[in-house]
Amino acid sequence: MSVNLGPLAPQLSDVKRNPQADGLGYNPRCLRRDINRNAAAVTTSNYTYDLITQNDNLYWFQTTMEGEFEKGKWGVHAGGHYTVSGDPAGDFYVSPGDPVFWLHHAQIDRVWWLWQAQKLEARLKDVAKTMTMNNQPPSRNGTLDDVNNMGVLGGDVLTRDLMSTLGGMGGKLCYIYE
């Protein structure tokens, strides 16, 4: 299997930069892995169990899930990406080109669902953090009434309509994990 597009800033020294400055040039290459045991250590079932059961509010659940990089802590989400790493998984901008990206994100969604289901009524209305990744640039806090542009797949959808995977509260999603 091969991928192309990206990397804009390759993390592996022998991966050539994209031939176009905008990163959209044709540059096929084979998938590669660079397994990182340190990252894998924070993705174990014990770590994930603690994530789900030891974080009572959304702010800390999200912070623990994502990781606190300034403190040298990787979370389950970042740990999953860096466990596989390599090319393209280690390139932030093109990592969705790696099939493992989708398996990893299905698990992240499932962990969110398990955490949310513990106090479903309250957590369907719980929003934390700001509108930008790592609050860069600084931005206001998110709300249930914020619009999420899903592009051609779904148009504009309010955050409140994405809070339940069960289609409740007028939601757009309709699935359950067994």
Question: Where do the language-model regions lie?
Answer:
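C-terminal accessory segments of proteins
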Residues: 1-178
